[in-house]
A protein has these predicted regions:
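Small-residue-enriched hydrophobic alpha-helices in membranes
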Residues: 1-25, 30-142
Length: 142
């Protein structure tokens, strides 16, 4: 996760990102340790306290498309798509429901389908390189 963009997000945008991440985590009805770790890490990087995150996780009826439409800055939209792709792929199981949320949010922000594919490929390549590096360096990530 490249954190430079975080400094440019408003507090409202940070909450929007977290709401969408929580919808994505719940999409496949199987919340993995990697996904929880991602949420904790990103919330800390966004400067959002745990109580706020817990409150967001407990929200049942988040309209993620309406939330995504609030992101009007192109750079922020692309960063959100990237982070969503990381989160959706982090458990090595990209479910159809997760993919649907990524696509619906991206489209709501005006991100082209071709750009979504390119971002997802880049994220997958990065994840593969990271895992390969861990194997080469004999790093136990377990």
């Amino acid at each position: 996760m490249d954190g430079d963009y975080i400094k440019t997000l408003s507090s409202e945008e940070r909450i929007i990102f977290l709401k969408i991440f929580c919808c994505l985590v719940r999409a496949d009805r199987n919340i993995d340790a990697e996904e929880i770790s991602f949420l904790k890490t990103i919330a800390a990087r966004y400067g959002v306290d745990n109580n706020t995150v817990i409150g967001i996780i407990k929200m049942q009826n988040i309209d993620f498309v309406a939330e995504a439409r609030k992101i009007t800055n192109r750079g922020h939209a692309l960063q959100l798509v990237k982070e969503m792709c990381v989160l959706a792929n982090i458990d090595n199981d990209l479910a159809d429901a997760e993919l649907d949320i990524v696509i619906d949010c991206a489209r709501a922000m005006g991100v082209e389908d071709e750009k979504i594919v390119l971002i997802n490929r880049w994220v997958l390549d990065s994840l593969i390189l990271t895992k390969t590096g861990q194997i080469i360096m004999e790093v136990n990530n377990g």
